[in-house]
Every structure is written in C-alpha cells, then in structure tokens.
C-alpha cells in the first residue's frame, strides 16, 4: 500500500537530490520519487526517502 497519491498535482521533494511533479506527498515514496535505489523495491513497507540523499537507508 502506498499512501502517496501521485495522481494529484503537487511536488514531491526527495531531500535536495530529486523533485517530482504531479505528486502530492508528505513523504517520498518510490512510486513518485525515482531517485531511490532499486533495492528499495524489495522493501515490504515501500521506499521512504529521508535526508538530503537517497540511499539504502530509505528502506524500512
């Protein structure tokens, strides 16, 4: 389940390394923020980007 409804208008900023349009997110999910590493796709709870960079720490 992805709480990020990316079909809505808005912006999803992933730290300072990524900005996604057409997305209304309070937290960056992989579905709207492609800067997350591919490994996060294996995370059951999804990928949440935190901080200024997106790395394996986004996996929860």
Swiss-Prot record:
InterPro entries: Metalthion_dom_sf, Metalthion_dom_sf_vert, Metalthion_vert, Metalthion_vert_metal_BS. Pfam families: Metallothio. Keywords: Metal-binding, Metal-thiolate cluster. Residues 29-60 are annotated as: Alpha. GO terms for molecular function: metal ion binding. A divalent metal cation 6 binds at residues 36, 40, 43, 59. A divalent metal cation 1 binds at residues 4, 6, 20, 23. A divalent metal cation 7 binds at residues 49, 54, 58-59. It comes from the Eukaryota. SUPFAM superfamilies: Metallothionein. Residues 1-28 are annotated as: Beta. A divalent metal cation 3 binds at residues 14, 18, 23, 28. A divalent metal cation 4 binds at residues 32-33, 43, 47. Gene3D superfamilies: Metallothionein Isoform II (4.10.10.10). Belongs to the metallothionein superfamily. Type 1 family. Metallothioneins have a high content of cysteine residues that bind various heavy metals. Class I metallothioneins contain 2 metal-binding domains: four divalent ions are chelated within cluster A of the alpha domain and are coordinated via cysteinyl thiolate bridges to 11 cysteine ligands. Cluster B, the corresponding region within the beta domain, can ligate three divalent ions to 9 cysteines. This is Metallothionein. It comes from Chelon auratus.
């Amino acid at each position: 389940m992805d709480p990020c409804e990316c079909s809505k208008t808005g912006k999803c900023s992933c730290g300072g390394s990524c900005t996604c349009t057409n997305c209304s997110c309070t937290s960056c999910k992989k579905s709207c923020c492609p800067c997350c590493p591919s490994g996060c796709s294996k995370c059951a709870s999804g990928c949440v980007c935190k901080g200024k960079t997106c790395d394996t720490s986004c996996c929860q």
